[in-house]
Amino acid sequence: MTRLTLALDVMGGDFGPSVTVPAALQALNANSQLTLLLVGNPDIITPLLAKADFEQRSRLQIIPAQSVIASDARPSQAIRASRGTSMRVALELVKEGRAEACVSAGNTGALMGLAKLLLKPLEGIERPALVTVLPHQQKGKTVVLDLGANVDCDSTMLVQFAVMGAVLAEEVVGIKNPRVALLNIGEEETKGLDSIREASLMLKTVPTINYIGYLEANELLTGKTDVLVCDGFTGNVTLKTMEGVVRMFLSLLKSQGEGKKRSWWLLLLKRWLQKSLTRRFSHLNPDQYNGACLLGLRGTVIKSHGAANQRAFAVAIEQAVQAVQRQVPQRIAARLESVYPAGFEPLDDGKGVNLRAHR
């Protein structure tokens, strides 16, 4: 394994350095080839490194940034006032080649806007999308995008997301000829928003995409598709609803419950079932797949959940390591031309629609 360097926006997220710094130390323990640039306020970060040993400190560097973008800041205002913030400095380290990826739990809209401004989208991509890989009940994985980077998406953007998701599923996850579906409120052709129906017509004309039609939200974890595409608003609500249900389910499995006194053998059976079911469904724990890749950029950016705990943020760091090692941006770029060559214009309602981003 070759050495790699990541830039962490340690000031971002609901809990800031109290979570991100311990998670950084956890990541260093797990990967001896990793170097981390901790971007933020040195006066806050330094005391949290008191437990770091000499070997860990040799692979850590604090990069000063005195301000932070608030989680509730409007993206446009945050971007205009972003100079010197921990998020922007972390992204600039990637742009300058001092780091190979950036990890942030900060403001999603600001991260997307700054990443697009500083790192630039790949040729043929209009806007990046947040993507994650979720486990499903068939013991496989499903690529899901967009998860919140773009609230409003037209049909062309949805098709671009489908292209990127399919390439990611094939090149990184290892799924041959991945099935691609659009998230919708029904499977009938007449269902859904105009943008979804138009995207469906367009995807049917792309010969290199294995498009299978619409999928409803209740089938997200069934394994019926390898890539699920939606706008950022729908994707974010769907993901967080699923996370909430899974957390509640796992919590119920672990709880002792209430009720009358039971015999010792019933209590023993209950505890055995709790442990067995908890192990069986532990792979669905949202902490284990925290970290959404901002797909479609010329560099690697990982967005952690704002409410991530130490374990979850450490997982996001590992996601960044894997994305760099698997050369995700390079592989996406290499495949885009073969997926829809320059000038390719599929038809939807009789009008030519160019899938390539207009520059």
Curated annotation (Swiss-Prot):
Its EC number is 2.3.1.274. Signal peptide: none annotated. It catalyses: a fatty acyl-[ACP] + phosphate = an acyl phosphate + holo-[ACP]. Coiled coil: none annotated. It is found in: Cytoplasm. Its main location: cytoplasm. One of its GO terms (biological process) is fatty acid biosynthetic process. GO terms for molecular function: phosphate:acyl-[acyl carrier protein] acyltransferase activity. Pfam families: FA_synthesis. One of its GO terms (cellular component) is cytoplasm. Keywords: Cytoplasm, Lipid biosynthesis, Lipid metabolism, Phospholipid biosynthesis, Phospholipid metabolism, Transferase. Pathway: Lipid metabolism; phospholipid metabolism. It is an enzyme of class 2 (transferase). Belongs to the PlsX family. Homodimer. Probably interacts with PlsY. Catalyzes the reversible formation of acyl-phosphate (acyl-PO(4)) from acyl-[acyl-carrier-protein] (acyl-ACP). This enzyme utilizes acyl-ACP as fatty acyl donor, but not acyl-CoA. This is Phosphate acyltransferase. It comes from Salmonella typhimurium (strain LT2 / SGSC1412 / ATCC 700720).
